[in-house]
Amino acid sequence: MTKDVTLGQLLRPRQSRIAWLVLLIALVLTVIAWRFSIILVADRTEAHFKTQSLQLKTAIEERLLNYEQVLAGSAGLFAVADLVGRDDWRLYVNKLDINRYYPGIQGIGYTARVEGDDVVSFVKRIREQGLPDYLVNPAGIRAEYHPIVFLEPSTQRNRRAYGYDAFGDPAHRIAMEAARDTGEATMTGKVVLVQEEVDDEQAGFLMYFPVYEGDSVPQIMAERRSRLRGFVFSAFRVNNLMDGIVGLISPFLDVRIYDSDVAIKDALMYGSNLGSLDDDYTFEMSQKVT
């Protein structure tokens, strides 16, 4: 047996309180469910963000390791050949097909170690090899020089770097000395490549790998220093290197790379979307690339 309840009866104090209580409970449950769904979505979004960030870090490190292995192979060329000529170097780099397989590399080159007293005869010898305008720069008297001798591909941009003595620049010398002393590849910090054009300038860095006399890395640091023959190196334009990696792994993330443990403007090397980058993030994660 049912009993119909009129609106008037519901509005009586007792029934009214029950109705409002039911409505309140329904609203509370709705809010709880809504908040739970927001938290669940946020947690999933944050987890996805962290996964993409870790994948990006791994991809960058793997790419740099591949480039390090390329330099190790390039250094090995000097160990198996008594004399590496300009044509030999060009053929070797052409076979690497860096534009296809190693995006971001501006060029692969070789710097020769030249004692201060030998620089005049060294320049003369290089000019006789087909570079009549070859000069060591910047000018100045130094105990030793490390001018660029080979740099391929032989583009107009790269040819401007012939003769550049990076060892005279502290930013390069720190990395070169570390590579010399350890026998391992070492990267510079943020630099502007000598090949850069004013209207197309971007941040860059170089990776140096030591070349020693003989067919093995000397075991003692003193011998590594005395038997240093030069360096093979790769020059990188950071935007070219990173755009492909970021676009593939995390196209919807704003990514910044700094040459510093502190995020300051002068140390900024790369920003994936500089037009939208600000300091207000939904999620944020900092990682050190090694």
Regions found by a protein language model. Give the residues of each.
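Intrinsically disordered, low-complexity polar/acidic regions
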Residues: E46-L54, A79-T290
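Intrinsic-disorder/low-complexity regions
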Residues: T2-K3, K265
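Juxtamembrane membrane-water interface segments immediately C-terminal to a transmembrane helix
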Residues: F36-Q69, A75, A79-L83, D87
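Intrinsically disordered, low-complexity segments enriched in polar/charged residues with Gly/Pro
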Residues: L7, L11, A19-W20, R35, ...
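Extreme N-terminal signal-anchor transmembrane helix of membrane signaling/transducer proteins, especially
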Residues: K3-V5, Q9-I39
